[in-house]
Amino acid sequence: MSQALTENRTVTSIEAQKAILKAFKQKRPIFLWGPMGIGKSELMQGTVDSGVLGNALLIDLRMALMEPTDIKGIPFYNKELGLMDWAPPIDLPTKELASQYDTVVLFLDELNSAPQSTQAAAYQLVLNHRVGNYVLPDNVVIVAAGNRETDKGVTYRM
């Protein structure tokens, strides 16, 4: 029987911010694990407010409160196409909105507290920068965050 290896690293907020900025430069998503109340959301807001990203916008989505359709959108009949189509969700950045900023940070907070079906929809955004017909604008970077399973909060294994 094999044991799963879990590696935890404790970092200061300055070290976390440096890792976040490095991930942003590489256009790579990052996941912040930590206990409830440690300041993951505040760290992201502070990073955006610091000006280090230029003119930046933080879109903070609380994933535990979302359904898969909040990410993928809702299907509707498109008369022009004669097919089913998707109405994109209002919470995700449009190209028009993103064009007003140097960087848009899409913060998927409480991701591992979201139902697994919602997590699956979010994974499409994180891994492919798209979900359904919706495509993230090029200047959008993704940060996800969640609580550790060991903290006995509401979490689902990822």
Residue ranges and their predicted role:
Residues 2-158:
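AAA+ P-loop NTPase catalytic core and its hallmark functional loops
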